[in-house]
A protein has these predicted regions:
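Mature N-terminal segment immediately following signal peptide/propeptide cleavage
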Residues: 22-70, 83-86, 522-523
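Repeat-blade elements of multi-bladed beta-propeller folds
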Residues: 31-35, 77-97, 125-158, 192-218, ...
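N-terminal pre-domain segments of enzymes
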Residues: 17-49, 378-406, 412, 486-490
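Segments forming glycine/polar-rich beta-alpha architectures that bind adenosine-containing cofactors
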Residues: 433-464, 469-471
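Positively charged n-region of N-terminal signal peptides that target proteins for export
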Residues: 1-4, 447
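Active-site neighborhoods of metal-dependent hydrolases
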Residues: 443-444, 458, 516-521, 533
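Extracytoplasmic/lumenal domain signature
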Residues: 55-68, 100-123, 137, 141-143, ...
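Bacterial N-terminal signal peptides
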Residues: 4-16
């Protein structure tokens, strides 16, 4: 098998501490972090499965977790977004109920399970979800319990340290193996508004977490602090505040997505969210640094190294949802360590990893101003000179879309009543088209970087949103209509501002988006040139419509891709229930495997068994908010 020779930098960031007897080849065959390596590349050096034989992939095993909720019994709907890890001969994964399972990676048989016993009936703003767990091995200990640990951050904001061999909580960590992450955080006023959804980051003897905070509830949202804890004891080592604490009442700016780590440079990279609330900023004047940014901190001290803001004074929920991807850019005969950062606007920023300076250049361009009383929108926003925007940046009545003339005309009439001056059109009482909407562009799925080919592959959404500011004296009837189901929109109060808000996909009477398809795409960017190599629709509406004649390519999507040395990109994500393999260099679809439920998760790949067989695994449990078929499956594929 051909294995890509990793650079020293890549190897240090990709492989955690292993016991003395573990072979380096075993480490390369692992998927040791949520995104494959600590730098978020989503790349595997395995090529046993490749372009010539991927068509032969078959299901190897299927595991049922039993953890699924359709919302009919009062519990939130489940969202199976986890990506397993494989390290130290075991697969570790989390479920929507936040349980942890240890599994034999060759057979799919369960070794142990751990239940943190979250309240399944709590109104969590993010639903029932957990994206993954993190492995850590103590380099100073050779034997004994909890030498190797699994860190789990739960939806009810607790951090657990578990013995990787048994699943038992590590008694020397926090209190009985857990930490209450709500402790020390200001302005938490109800259960379910301060949460954890992503896998923690680890570097040296630190475990680092951000938080997920409910959007649009009020001005004084909880503090979005990022904190590092001692991986052995659970003691707080440092905290960093994206929004300075003295800027009350503004909160949030939190890091709810995955943190990336550069072990060689001793740096961590944070994708920060929006300041509160998302759609009205009169109590948070200015750019609101360091919200809506990618930020580099010293891992040892938590001190700011550099920051780069992707959106000034956010009014669109354009938080930095994608994990920063670390790689090496080869261009014009030189190599540059970079951070590749996408965001919901559909723009892709490539920054020098050490300085935060744009590699291709960025310019501040004028954008529409706000006509809402008290709102001082930023007059400019940053746009990268390269690559070009991945998503369309404006929707007008001229390109209103419908599946038939009546549907198109209904969309056109609706759009005529809404403000649409291009991307960054400010929210208004009249109503505004936000395009791209708050689903992106790029979302938490991020993208995958094949460094040998210099190709960055990502999925995007091309969905318009209809956003309204609701004067305070008109808000209660709108909220009641939403609660009763007579209004389809998501409605939030934005307490502390003069306006509530509503948002929904800008749709036709049949419920289809008013923008032209594809509504979801898979795109490859050649970073050596800063240009788009190829783009293809992702998925079809075949599982959403009864008439095959009305199947449309390119659906909304959540999840993400991985890339391999075998020249393959694996991704599910779309609203049809398939895992697909694409040729990374051309975008040609080479294979697809039917899933029993929605695949709104990122796949992963690894070697297992005496002969080192390559498997590709994905969680197929659907997504309550996206509306795909729910289930509880984890499925592994391999060659016969």
């Amino acid at each position: 098998m051909r294995l890509l020779v990793l650079t020293a930098i890549g190897l240090m960031s990709a492989i955690p501490h292993f016991a003395a007897g573990e072979a380096r080849s075993e480490a390369i065959g692992n998927w040791a972090f949520y995104a494959g390596d600590a730098g978020g590349s989503r790349y595997s050096p395995l090529d046993q499965i490749n372009k010539t034989n991927v068509v032969e992939l078959k299901p190897a095993w299927e595991l049922h977790t039993g953890d699924v909720s359709d919302g009919s019994d009062g519990r939130p709907k489940s969202e199976f977004e986890t990506t397993p890890i494989v390290v130290a001969g075991t697969m570790f994964l989390s479920t929507p109920f936040n349980r942890v399972l240890a599994v034999d990676p060759e057979t799919g048989k369960e070794k142990w399970s751990f239940d943190p016993k979250i309240d399944l009936r709590e109104h969590y703003s993010e639903g029932l979800v957990n994206r993954g767990v993190t492995f850590w091995s103590d380099p100073g200990v050779t034997d004994g319990p909890c030498r190797q640990r699994i860190f789990l951050a739960t939806i009810d904001a607790r951090l657990f340290a578990l013995d990787a061999l048994t699943g038992h909580p590590c008694s020397d960590f926090g209190i009985g193996g857990q930490i209450d992450l709500k402790a020390g955080i200001a302005n938490i006023k109800r259960g379910g508004e301060y949460e954890e959804t992503s896998a923690p980051a680890v570097i040296d003897d630190l475990v680092i977490v951000g938080s997920s905070i409910a959007d649009n509830d009020r001005v004084d949202s909880p503090d979005g602090a990022v904190r590092a804890f001692d991986a052995k004891t659970g003691k707080l080592r440092w905290s960093w505040h994206p929004i300075p604490e003295n800027l009350a009442p503004t909160g949030a700016g939190n890091v709810w997505s995955t943190i990336s780590v550069d072990a060689q440079r001793g740096m961590v990279f944070l994708p920060t969210g929006s300041a509160s609330p998302d759609y009205h900023g009169f109590k948070r004047p200015g750019d609101n640094k360091w919200a809506n940014s990618v930020v580099a901190l010293s891992a040892r001290t938590g001190e700011l190294v550099w920051g780069f803001q992707l959106v000034h004074h956010d009014l669109w929920d354009y938080d930095t949802a994608a994990q920063p991807v670390l790689g090496v850019l080869r261009r014009e005969g030189s190599e540059t360590p970079v951070v590749i950062q996408g965001n919901k606007t559909g723009n892709l920023f490539v920054l020098n990893r050490e300085t935060g300076k744009p590699v291709f250049g960025v310019e501040e361009r004028p954008v529409p101003r706000s006509d809402t009383e008290g709102e001082d929108a930023s007059p400019t926003q940053p746009f990268p000179l390269l690559p070009p925007p991945l998503a369309p940046l404006q929707l007008t009545t001229n390109n209103a879309w419908g599946i038939n003339p009546e549907e198109r005309e209904a969309c056109r009439v609706k759009m005529e009543k809404l403000k649409s001056e291009g991307i960054f059109t400010a929210p208004s009482v009249q109503g505004t088209i936000a395009f791209p909407g708050n689903l992106g562009g790029m979302n938490w799925s991020s993208g995958a970087f094949d460094q040998s080919r210099q190709l960055f592959v990502t999925n995007i959404n091309n969905l318009p949103m209809e956003v309204h500011l609701i004067p305070r004296d008109q808000y209660k009837p709108v909220e009641k209509a939403a609660q009763q189901g007579t209004l389809r929109a998501e409605v939030s109060p934005q307490h502390g501002t003069p306006y509530g808000m509503s948002r929904e996909v800008l749709h036709s009477p049949l419920g289809l988006p008013c923008s032209p398809p594809p509504w979801g795409e898979l795109i490859a960017i050649d970073l050596s040139k800063g240009s788009i190599r190829w783009r293809v629709p992702l998925g079809t509406t075949a599982d959403m419509v009864k008439d095959p004649a009305h199947v449309i390519p390119g659906t909304p999507n959540l999840g993400g891709p991985i890339v391999t040395a075998g020249g393959l990109t694996f991704i599910a994500s779309a609203m049809d229930n398939y895992l697909r393999a694409f040729d990374t260099e051309t975008g040609q679809e080479l294979w697809k495997g039917r899933l029993p439920a929605g695949g709104q998760a990122m796949p992963m790949t690894y070697l297992a068994g005496q002969n080192g067989k390559q498997f590709v695994v994905i969680a197929a449990g659907g997504h309550g908010k996206l509306g795909t078929k729910l289930g509880d499956s984890v499925i592994a594929y391999s060659l016969p």
